[in-house]
Regions:
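Extended amphipathic alpha-helical interaction segments
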Residues: 1-62
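A cross-kingdom marker for long, charged
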Residues: 43-116
Length: 116
């Protein structure tokens, strides 16, 4: 599930970036083209995400004792732990989508400035 949630978040962030680009007339991309472009990269995003998640988990949990790690695993399996994880993802996904949109809009403004 961790990989799936991160892949979905990355795909949504990429769509948000394209939508940000489309705030400029210079990048008038139809929504269906944005979605095709983003979906065409799903396999690449998934592979990158799997690598990232493995590396992140290795680094993040390496200094934790086995006992503390087991406590975290136990918490993650409870309804409260699952709700906490969903809340974290919802917050991060909203933030990444907003930032991606703003970066796309800034890139569009920058490119228009270059054309002038």
């Amino acid at each position: 599930k961790l990989v799936e949630r991160n892949v979905a978040g990355a795909l949504n962030a990429n769509v948000a970036f394209f939508r940000g680009l489309s705030t400029s007339e210079a990048f008038d991309l139809p929504e269906d083209q944005m979605l095709r472009d983003v979906w065409s990269r799903e396999d690449e995003i998934r592979a990158d995400t799997e690598d990232w998640v493995f590396g992140y988990m290795t680094m993040a949990y390496q200094p934790i004792s086995d006992e503390k790690l087991q406590s975290y695993v136990d918490l993650s399996g409870t309804e409260a732990g699952k709700a906490l994880n969903r809340a974290f993802f919802a917050g991060f996904e909203a933030l990444f989508e907003e930032v991606s949109f703003e970066i796309g809009a800034a890139a569009a403004r920058f490119s228009i400035g270059d054309e002038l």
